[in-house]
From Swiss-Prot:
SMART domains registered for this protein in UniProt: CA
Lineage top rank: taxon: Eukaryota
Protein name in the entry: Protocadherin gamma-B4
Lineage start: Eukaryota, Metazoa, Chordata, Craniata, Vertebrata
Glycosylation sites: 417, 543
Function: Potential calcium-dependent cell-adhesion protein. May be involved in the establishment and maintenance of specific neuronal connections in the brain.
Domain Cadherin: 31-133, 134-242, 243-345, 346-450, 451-560, 568-673
Comp. bias regions, Basic residues: 913-923
Gene name, Swiss-Prot/TrEMBL: PCDHGB4
Topological type in the membrane: Single-pass type I membrane protein
Amino acid sequence: MGSGAGELGRAERLPVLFLFLLSLFCPALCEQIRYRIPEEMPKGSVVGNLATDLGFSVQELPTRKLRVSSEKPYFTVSAESGELLVSSRLDREEICGKKPACALEFEAVAENPLNFYHVNVEIEDINDHTPKFTQNSFELQISESAQPGTRFILGSAHDADIGSNTLQNYQLSPSDHFSLINKEKSDGSKYPEMVLKTPLDREKQKSYHLTLTALDFGAPPLSSTAQIHVLVTDANDNAPVFSQDIYRVSLSENVYPGTTVLQVTATDQDEGVNAEITFSFSEASQITQFDLNSNTGEITVLNTLDFEEVKEYSIVLEARDGGGMIAQCTVEVEVIDENDNAPEVIFQSLPNLIMEDAELGTHIALLKVRDKDSRHNGEVTCKLEGDVPFKILTSSRNTYKLVTDAVLDREQNPEYNITVTARDRGKPPLSSSSSITLHIGDVNDNAPVFSQSSYIVHVAENNPPGASISQVSASDPDLGPNGQVSYCIIASDLEQRELSSYVSISAESGVVFAQRAFDHEQLRAFELTLQARDQGSPALSANVSLRVLVDDRNDNAPRVLYPALGPDGSALFDMVPRAAEPGYLVTKVVAVDADSGHNAWLSYHVLQASEPGLFSLGLRTGEVRTARALGDRDAVRQRLLVAVRDGGQPPLSATATLHLVFADSLQEVLPDITDRPDPSDLEAELQFYLVVALALISVLFLVAMILAIALRLRRSSSPASWSCFQPGLCVKSESVVPPNYSEGTLPYSYNLCVAHTGKTEFNFLKCNEQLSSGQDILCGDSSGALFPLCNSSELTSHQQAPPNTDWRFSQAQRPGTSGSQNGDDTGTWPNNQFDTEMLQAMILASASEAADGSSTLGGGAGTMGLSARYGPQFTLQHVPDYRQNVYIPGSNATLTNAAGKRDGKAPAGGNGNKKKSGKKEKK
């Protein structure tokens, strides 16, 4: 009695236990998650929260490792939120074609514990395709004897969308003779038929032009048009008639190209040409798998068929008689499936290794089998090949788990080749196999070993940032993470804060990258200590040294130190004695190169010379010497364009322009420089005369005379010429400075700026301070000022110091070709009118710049900015009375100079340059 009650109690508990277990596994095995989304959703769009729909919390996501298992990567699961995201383009027409329902089915895989979940995503159609005709225009030939009510089939349009988004209606442009009827085929597609409303008369009108419009009912609706050209012909009142409106035939997918599908027939009650029938595919049928004999109507297979791609074909045929009348029929071809596809085994997840102490039943891999065939040809079973300590468990439909079935021992078998064979139920059955190699993991007992004990690498400077400069490699005989080596930099002879800005190393590959462009001139070598570390626990490591040597490249062009450039970038002039003998040292081009080795070897070359053969240039020294004596036909001013090249490959170069003037004193050079007209003034003067000439021609002479007198009176009454006597002593017009020149050889150099003589207003200033010694004649940066600015409190326009009759240049102050050359120790103030005017123009131009406050020249007040060598005694107090010597350029005022009248001789030509023999050279 008691045993019976106990058995009865156990019997009652078994269904309860079964229902409990079923409630646990049924959500994973039975439920299917469904979503519905429109096609063409952007990549990254959210389909739904898969984790929430499966009952997972956000905290479980890292351990459950929820992911998608599908053949094509249409979707992915966000690891952070568990949302199902679109990962590739969803084109419903490409995925499902014309199917009314389109859905993507796949499995969602979750681990710990391992489960599969079926997900179904329905793709809704959107109106993203416009109806399109196969051609832009159609031509119809209609007999004039055609009766009203005769129908003519027109070319159809195609719309890849479905439902209301697909082609729904055709419209015909208004016509007195034609109307349009929308027809529907057996497959539901629409096609237009044009109906003749009134009889045609070819003698009245030979042709008609109509517009056919195809529309869909999408939102917004889309449409396209085609032109219909109707030609009216003579009578052909009977159209061809097919023996059947619809032909149906079944074909095996394995039939060979050339196999006859069927033969259609059509008759025409007309006679002669109007009864000759030709067959063709309709323009709406884009058929590439079949061929049609236009005369016999025989349809044959053109290309191989595939049930897995297309299961049936709907072909529209046309029969056209000689009069242009057309009849249509439909041929429906059903493709029969054959067992021509072997099953496939796909491993969804593959472990890198499994530890040898893994427990029985440990999950190793997930695999899925599939067969493209249908029915029993697509039913698949799978099994393991060979004697291996594993087994396969069925998880869900066509999904299996590979788990351990025995204790593993790495010392006996460090790895296993696991082969899974899938076989279908077709006749004959087809099968396929897939293999994986499973490694058995061990403990971390080997440290990484570098392939070399140390590394030395050469890197050319100016390398691109991010370039690879070296690669180190270390091997570890361990398996899995114990043998995975990562690299890092642990020490260097560079400062720690600068290390990351110089080099970095790839932790995976050991490739050392330059983070910046190296400069041989700043850093020639450095050393790194690299470490290779495995991923074991505890981790083992090894160190190695890497020495990087930075090689020099020709990346620095030569830099010309002498001659220096003026503010406008041109070279200053050098003065050469007129009697200079061949070999006379004129000047020397001095340049440097920041590179080293051959890249810093410099050579000097003449690129251009105004008088070839007059000068020679030292290839390595850069010395410019006279190659011959100055001839009578040689110009006084010469120009040399010199190139300085280094020895690099390719060589870099710099250029310098030398302006050489043959003269025995500075006074000879000044008139030649100052008298040159400004090109811009010449152009302005030319334009002025052209305007005056045109005015004289176009305007009456009397009016021109009145305007000229008025302009003359206005100019004579302008007080601008007295602007220099304003309290501020400011110049009204900015002085114009011609190009800079330098006079001198190696021991000395003159820098001279001369104000333009055509438009400058002169202000006479008196400066009481003396010029400080040791300052050279320099040119301003941009204003063209020559002389230093005097204190405004010391300027006056009413007093002028008397001339100093004992004004001299001392021997140390006299210009010459070298410091050792001798000359006359006496020098007088210029006594002729030209030199006096020239000197005053220089002084007044300097005063004008000083009044503007823009002069940047050195020198004390009253010294004209001359250096100590030429300037200490040359002060403004030696300038003759400006009321006697002033000369305003552009005027015809008579110039007076008491000294010039008193002594008509030219000033003494002091500092005449000597030849090498020591004799004086006459002008």
